[in-house]
Amino acid sequence: MHQITDDMAKNIILYLVLICFGMQGYAKGKSEFMESKHIPLVYDKENTAECYPQIKMRSFEELPSIPELPDPFAWADGSGRSTDFKDWERHRSEIMQMLYHYEIGEKPAVKKEQMKAGIVDDTLYVDITVGGETLRLTAGITYPEGEGPFPAIIGIGFGTGSLPKDIFDKRGVAQIAFRFQQVMSHTQKRGQEPINRLYPDQTEMGAYCAWPWGISRIIDALEIVGEASRIDMKHIAVSGCSFAGKMALFAGALDERIALTIAQEPGGGGVNSWRVSETLGNVETLGRTNYAWFKESMRRFSNCVDRLPIDHHELAALIAPRALLVLGNPDYEWFAERSNYESSKAAREVWSAFGIADRMGYSIEGGHPHCQLPLSQYPEVEAFVDKFLLGKKNIDTNVTKAIIETQE
C-alpha cells in the first residue's frame, strides 16, 4: 500500500511542478503561438480528440507512484513530451481516456440520427433513442428582448446556476436551465437511473460522466433545431456551484462546443488536486468524496493517490484552449481552497504554454456565504462574460486572485 508521506507531500509543492512542466512549456509555446488568433476560442464538435487511438491502460497493480502532479504534456506511453499546440488534442485524448477509465466511466457517444429535438413555448426538448428505449430531456430557456441569435449560459438547476441573474440579464444573454435529475439523481442508485434506460450495462458510470452527457445532449438539441433556437452556438457558457460547480467543470472539459466554463466553489473532486488535498486537514479527499459521482473502483486509490496516473489540474486543462474561470471560497475548510489554488496555478500553465493565459483565471476570496457571489468577484465574472460570451475586445481577463497567498 502506498501512502502520501510527509516527504512525498513536500514533493507535491506546485513550484517544483512548474519547473517540471509549466515554465518549459511556456518558454516554447509563447514564442510559437503568441498570436492567439490562430488558436480557436471554441469548436463546432463535441470532442475533436475522438480520432485518436485508445491508449493502453495499466492495471491497478502496474501503476507506479507519482507523488508530484502529473505532467499534462507527457505522452502516456512514456515516449516523451510535447508542448506544441498541434499536439494538444492528442494530449486531451489521452487525459480523457484515463479520466474515463480510472474516475468516472466513459461518456457514451450519441449519433444525431438517434435524436429528435424541438422547442415549444421556450422549452427545448430532445428525445434520445438507444436500443429501443427513449429518454426525453427538457430545458427551459429565458430569452432577452430581441430576435437573436443570443449568447447563452447553461446553468445547473437554474438558468444562470448560482451566479447573479442580473449579470446576464443586462448583457442580453439567454439562460438555459439544465435539469440534471432527468439524467441521474444526486444520490444515484447504480443501474436504476434515467440514463440507464439507454445504457443498462453502464452501472459503474459516475454522475460526473452522466450529467455532462446530458448537457451535451442539450447542446445537440440546440444544433438540431437550428435557427429556431435563437442561440449563438459559438458563444455558450456553463456554470454551477458546489457539486454543480464540479458538474460544470466536467461538462466544459468534455464538450468543446462550450466556449466558457465558470466553476463556482467546486471543492474536492473539482479543480482541486487529489494529491494536494491528501496533505491538508478536514477536507474532501479522494477517499472521502461522494462515490455516487465517481466509479466505485476509484476507491482503490483512497490510500495511494500517488498511483493515480492523472490529477485534476489536468481535468481543468482539458478545457484549454477555451475559457475557464474558477471561483473559490476559503471560509469553508472542507472545500480545500489551498488545493484549488495549487491545482489552478498548475492548470493555467497549459494555457500559458500556448500564449493564451488570459483565457484561464481563478479568484479565491472569502467573506461571503457558500454559492453567493460577493460584489468583489463581480468584476472577474463580468470580464470573462464580456470577453468570451459577448466577444468584446480589450477586456482584461488575467485573473489570478487568491487570498490563500496571504495565509502562508
Question: Can you describe what each PLM-predicted range is?
Answer:
Residues M1-A9:
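N-terminal secretory signal peptides that target proteins for export/translocation
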Residues A9-Y15:
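Sec-dependent signal peptide recognition
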Residues V17-G25:
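Hydrophobic h-region of N-terminal signal peptides that target proteins for export
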Residues K30-T138, Y143-G148, E256, A320-E408:
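Alpha/beta-hydrolase-fold serine-hydrolase catalytic core, especially in secreted/extracellular enzymes
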Residues P149-I153, K170-Q175, M233-H235, E256-L260, ...:
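Loop/turn elements at helix/coil->beta-strand transitions in domains of secreted/extracellular proteins
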Residues G155-A228, G267-V276:
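Cap/lid segment of the alpha/beta-hydrolase catalytic domain
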Residues R217-T279:
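Primarily recognizes the serine-hydrolase "nucleophile elbow" in alpha/beta-hydrolase
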Residues E227, Q264-L315, A336-S344, S352-A357:
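Mobile cap/lid helix-loop segments that gate and shape the active-site cleft of serine hydrolases
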